[in-house]
């Protein structure tokens, strides 16, 4: 039997960028806003994504 492939780490910014490319700006902004809502804080990474997701 073969071992499964190693897990690839994706940064939060990479994940938001991927969502923007796949689903569009509105989806990426909502995804970012909901992430901040779920963790009950606004992190610097979230602000960077919100500022850059529509560029």
Swiss-Prot record:
Q: In which tissues is it expressed?
A: Expressed only in roots.
Q: What induces it?
A: Down-regulated in root tissues but up-regulated in shoot tissues in response to cadmium (CdCl(2)).
Spell out the subcellular localization from the entry: Cell membrane; Secreted, Cell wall
Q: Where are the transmembrane segments?
A: 24-40
Named from the GO MF annotations, one term is:
metal ion sequestering activity
What is the first-listed, main subcellular location in coarse terms? membrane
| Superkingdom of source | Eukaryota
Q: Name one GO biological process term.
A: cellular detoxification
Q: How does it sit in the membrane?
A: Single-pass membrane protein
GO CC list: extracellular region; plant-type cell wall; plasma membrane
List keywords of the entry alphabetically: Cell membrane, Cell wall, Membrane, Metal-binding, Secreted, Stress response, Transmembrane, Transmembrane helix
Q: Which family does it belong to?
A: Belongs to the CYSTM1 family.
Q: What does this protein do?
A: Confers resistance to heavy metal ions (e.g. cadmium (CdCl(2)) and copper (CuCl(2))) by chelating them at the plasma membrane of root cells, thus stopping their entry and reducing their accumulation.
What name does UniProt use for this protein?
Protein CADMIUM TOLERANCE 2
The species this protein was found in:
Oryza sativa subsp. japonica
């Amino acid at each position: 039997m073969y071992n499964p492939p190693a897990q690839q780490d994706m940064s939060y910014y990479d994940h938001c960028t991927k969502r923007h490319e796949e689903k569009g700006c509105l989806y990426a902004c909502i995804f970012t806003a909901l992430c901040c809502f779920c963790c009950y804080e606004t992190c610097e990474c979230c602000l960077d994504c919100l500022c850059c997701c529509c560029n």
